[in-house]
């Protein structure tokens, strides 16, 4: 039994075994020029009656459900009262439920993308390095476990130095619990808009330049407490992972070897390029 989802539907890898309920559709911002996830949808908050009916139906077929993920990208855009209503009903209908999550919840992703204001402006992220640090600081004070995502190559060749230097600085100030580094890949449907909003020629990085950025990020990211670091997304040239600062030297040694042996890199067709 599967719900009649409004596709496309996304969830983090960690939610592969979770039951998914779409309490919102699309993204309320939906202006990041590099992102195509919800461009085919207009943001909407689903009616409680529809969500309730789906919970009722799935609780009959899967009463032992232990994990639930609330989609789409902006479940937390619901009002507090709406969220409480959904959560209370989920725990009522699924007596073995242990965890309910959504994008921007603890241990899920917060897309920083870059710490450089110029890059953030050019990709219409709607944030600055300072505002990102402030938002993350508020979340940390309230007990959130922060998992932050950045995008290698987002500054192109022109802004590669500033992109990585400022991203490492922001990450060091934020002190997240997890960091995921992806590599820029534009869906063909996003290419023209990305280039137009960038407002100047954009040169994509080659694989060696992406490794250079990853190397500089690991070198300059100076967390005060241990941070789980992952560059193992499908878009990455190779899976590099560890805990900073303890595994810094090991990860840098791996990157050095990859530069010497480019044949070890993941073929582009396996990265969706």
What are these regions (language model features)?
Residues 1-15, 169-273:
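Auxiliary Fe-S-binding modules of radical SAM enzymes
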Residues 107, 115-119, 139-163, 182-189, ...:
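Conserved strand-turn element in the central/C-terminal portion of the radical SAM core barrel
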Residues 5-50:
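Canonical Radical SAM [4Fe-4S] cluster-binding loop centered on the CxxxCxxC motif
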